[in-house]
Amino acid sequence: MGNQVEKLTHLSYKEVPTADPTGVDRDDGPRIGVSYIFSNDDEDVEPQPPPQGPDGGGLPDGGDGPPPPQPQPYDPRLHEVECSVFYRDECIYQKSFAPGSAALSTYTPENLLNKCKPGDLVEFVSQAQYPHWAVYVGNFQVVHLHRLEVINSFLTDASQGRRGRVVNDLYRYKPLSSSAVVRNALAHVGAKERELSWRNSESFAAWCRYGKREFKIGGELRIGKQPYRLQIQLSAQRSHTLEFQSLEDLIMEKRRNDQIGRAAVLQELATHLHPAEPEEGDSNVARTTPPPGRPPAPSSEEEDGEAVAH
């Protein structure tokens, strides 16, 4: 809870869940990384979409001033951050807008239902909001972590008017069978607050599909190394890399970037980071290095409660 410091002195390196099975640490050089020490995430107090009128637009405000500007259609390429996640040298997650990549196209909740199969992971997205993840369990319903409780909802209700998509292919772990994914999700319906083992909807949904404890609170021990890397694509030829002690920490930073949006992330990096010379033989990617001691800022849109590990 809070700023607790974990006692690791009695553990050997072999007890660390993500240790290299060969026993060889390929990352012995100096490392710069970030690690969250606060305890709760985000989306349950996220700003809600404005009420919609019968034509899908906003309701009139009844004032005498000019009507508010019409909201622009949601475009993932404008609002979302293209990024990859690595555990050591293995890519375990990738969000790419490369030509021919249709997986990030979004659909209305009604159209999304036609694309879902039991066991699918669904992501609802909207500008300036945290992505909300859910597990489709069939019969037009999803199971998701919402307001510190795992609940079963109709997909259209869980969307809260946001567009969505199936995101089975973002994480590159081997998935469980569809029936096992549905079983995992349904088994935790009703769990809430201190019974929870996940900080956010993404970690819960991903755990249901892949069954990896790295998605759980405290699923990995922090031993001072940063084996996880979040590579943010700045442009076609430049990227910036942040390193993390755990997948849990990395997901929180990735979700913060999704919430503030691509333009804000690029502006933040331009303001706080300084370009470094590309390494020899690595001319296609310019790397940037965070100033010493710069952790990612916690989001102002945190949950109003805590989830704890068991």
Curated annotation (Swiss-Prot):
Positions of the UniProt region annotated as Disordered: 1-76, 274-310
Name of the gene this protein is made from: LRATD2
InterPro entries: LRAT_dom, LRATD1_LRATD2
Cysteines engaged in disulfide bonds, as pairs: none
Compositionally skewed regions (Pro residues) per UniProt: 65-74, 289-298
Species in which this protein is naturally found: Homo sapiens
UniProt note on tissues of expression: Expressed in esophageal squamous cell carcinomas.
Domain LRAT: 122-217
Residue spans of biased composition, Acidic residues class: 300-310
Superkingdom of the organism of origin: Eukaryota
Bias kind Gly residues: ranges: 54-64
PROSITE patterns according to UniProt: LRAT
Protein name: Protein LRATD2
GO cellular component, one term: cytoplasm
Family named by the database record: Belongs to the LRATD family.
